[in-house]
């Protein structure tokens, strides 16, 4: 798809594989039951769009940006989010996540302060690196094999979350909330033995 401008449009049941969206702008659009597999964004923007029951796998980006996207009941796999950040003081790529499954996603140097991940989301095999995550809410979230590396997690809530690995030596954790028995895994980086 090339040089297309869409505002306030609704797209339902579309399936794209290997498609390159070049010089396209999507503003305030809704995508329902759509599939995007190994697609690319090239000089394309998505602004304040909503995705419902969509699957996005292996998204690639060149000189593109996404802002304030809402995802509900979506499967997001193998996405590196940092290249999708807007330059300057624009909103972050993700506005809300609800009942979503995120697998093998990478989030680098992103702002998730006060973000609520607890709305029925599952985050598997993903990485948060050098992210701002103060007051983020992961309460009850399945975080199987998800890592937090050098993140600011002050006052973040991990109670009843499971499967996470936190770099406690490189992350800021003051007043973060954890629950047992999962919190014992935080000690792994200290190379100590508990008995």
Describe each model-derived feature in a short phrase.
Residues 1-195:
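Tandem repeat scaffolds
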């Amino acid at each position: 798809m090339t040089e297309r401008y869409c505002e306030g449009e609704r797209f339902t049941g579309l399936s794209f594989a290997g498609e390159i969206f070049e010089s396209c702008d999507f503003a305030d659009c809704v995508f329902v039951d759509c599939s995007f597999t190994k697609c690319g964004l090239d000089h394309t923007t998505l602004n304040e769009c909503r995705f419902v029951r969509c699957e996005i796998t292996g998204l690639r980006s060149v000189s593109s940006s996404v802002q304030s996207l809402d995802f509900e009941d979506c499967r997001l796999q193998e996405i590196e989010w940092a290249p999708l950040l807007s330059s300057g003081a624009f909103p972050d790529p993700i506005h809300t996540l609800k009942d979503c499954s995120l697998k093998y996603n990478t989030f680098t140097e992103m702002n998730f302060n006060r973000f609520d991940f607890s709305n029925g989301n599952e985050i598997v095999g993903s990485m948060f690196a050098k992210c701002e995550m103060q007051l983020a809410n992961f309460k009850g979230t399945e975080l199987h094999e998800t890592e937090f590396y050098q993140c600011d997690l002050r006052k973040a809530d991990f109670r009843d979350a499971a499967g996470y690995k936190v770099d406690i030596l490189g992350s800021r954790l003051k007043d973060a909330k954890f629950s047992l028995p999962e919190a014992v895994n935080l000690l792994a980086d200290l190379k100590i033995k508990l008995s």
